[in-house]
Every structure is written in C-alpha cells, then in structure tokens.
Amino acid sequence: GVSALSLSLARAYCGKILHHGIVNNVKIVRVFRKGMARYEQRLMDEHLEILDGETAELKHQFVDDNRMTFGQFTDKHNNYASREAALLLDAEFHLTGSQIVSQDHGKEVERKRAQKNRYAKMPLFWRAFGYFVYRYIIKLGFLDGKEGFLWDFLQGWWYRTLVDAKIFEIKRACGNDKKKICQYLK
C-alpha cells in the first residue's frame, strides 16, 4: 500500500515564487505514515527513507517560502558551509573511514548525489563560478528578476565560494595531512 506522499517543490525567495534556474521539478516526500520512514544519518542533506510501501505523487506543490533576513541567511549558510567543507574534505581524504552505503533513495536523490560527486572533483572557486553561470544564465535564473539574481548569487555562488574558502583555509593550515585536518575540524 501507500506509505508516503510526494509533492513537487516550488521555491519562493524574497516573496516571489521562482520559476527558472534549478528550482523546478524536484519531488520531495513531506507526508508519510508513522513508522514507515526515517531520516538518513548524515551531517547535512538528509533524505527521508521510505521503509516499506509505495510513494504516491500528489499533484499539488509544496512552496518553500524562505522568509529569512539576509543576516539570518548569512548565519545559517555560514554554518552549512562549515559542515559542507568537512564533508567534501572527508570525501577527498577519507577522514572518518566511513563509507556511504548506496541505497535506493529514488532517482532524484541519486542523480543529485552523482552531480555533487562530479562538482566535488572540480577546482576550488571555479566550480562555484561555473555553478552560478549554469543556474543564472544557462537555466535562465535571470528571468526571475532581482529575486532570482539574489537566490542564484547567494545560494549558488556566494555560499559555494564560502565552502571553497573554508576548504582552502583548512588545506593552507594543514596541507594534505589527514591527522591535522581532523584536528582542525574538531
């Protein structure tokens, strides 16, 4: 039977629903039967794992209407950037010795993880710039006006550059010494 319901995600930023860039056609599970789902154990970007049953897709949208001030956004993403830098360093240097067990989380989740793995192998700083160009120019984010620019710039370039700056800072202080990197991250 049906254990979970998925919806199409729509993003709003600065009070405007964004229609371009990379915000469309993402399916997310937000409703599920008690005991039939659990969140993955990850530092960030956790996904819901459906333990048993089918997932039905609703025709309605879930609107992620971000109402944070720019100060709140900056604080939140600074914290996220530290965690993402740690995850990327772990992937590069195998710091924790843990290995992510591949499970079927759905095509969307697996596709996004494959994209993140490709992104992680690109050169620092250039990848953030390229990601912004992809979102804002190629995927037509500029058609969403000032709100689209702010979303793509802050979330797509500024945040990604901050992650790379944190990685750069750690590598500058520690080199490629796994032990030093682990100490730095504590």
Question: What do these predicted regions represent?
Answer:
Residues 1-171, 180-184:
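Catalytic-site signature of metal-activated, phosphate-bearing donor transferases
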